[in-house]
Amino acid sequence: MSIPNNLRYSEEHEWVKTEGNEVVIGITHFAQNELGDIVFVELPEVGATIEADEPFGSVESVKTVSELYAPVSGKVVAVNEELSDQPELVNESPYEGAWMVKVELSDASQVEKLLTAEKYAEMTNQD
């Protein structure tokens, strides 16, 4: 399973890509693999405020419904609308086409506290 080195990771299996004062958030390949076929994604609206370690949406698969936990705090500035019609993108392209939200950071230091690719690989025994 791939774990891109340019991203940071949460213990709840979300990834974070930094773009200036904003971050892009999605779920990892490991998470989508554990969930199985994704059939529905619920995301917050643009303008919503999310808080680190708090739920901000959910992913429903044929196996279960899993909450999405915000790895950082901030204001949602964009939502991947494609996931409404094509939730299977999460399985097909978890790091590219299936990004979930873009967030304007309220505290950029939160990103540095997330796991590196190496630490995430150790946590998920994918090294």
UniProtKB/Swiss-Prot annotation:
Cofactor section: (R)-lipoate
Nucleotide-binding in keyword set: no
Domain Lipoyl-binding: from-to ranges: 22-104
SUPFAM superfamilies per the UniProt record, alphabetical: Single hybrid motif
Domain of life, per lineage: Bacteria
A Pfam family that the UniProt record links to this protein: GCV_H
InterPro entries recorded: 2-oxoA_DH_lipoyl-BS, Biotin_lipoyl, GCV_H, GCV_H/Fam206, GCV_H_sub, Single_hybrid_motif
Biological processes annotated in GO: glycine decarboxylation via glycine cleavage system
Residues bearing the modification N6-lipoyllysine: K63
Alphabetized UniProt keyword annotations: Lipoyl
Nucleotidyltransferase in keyword set: no
GO cellular component: cytosol; glycine cleavage complex
Cofactor note: Binds 1 lipoyl cofactor covalently.
Its job: The glycine cleavage system catalyzes the degradation of glycine. The H protein shuttles the methylamine group of glycine from the P protein to the T protein. Is also involved in protein lipoylation via its role as an octanoyl/lipoyl carrier protein intermediate.
Family, similarity comment: Belongs to the GcvH family.
Subunit relationships: The glycine cleavage system is composed of four proteins: P, T, L and H.
HAMAP family per UniProt: GcvH
Protein name listed in UniProt: Glycine cleavage system H protein
Gene designation: gcvH
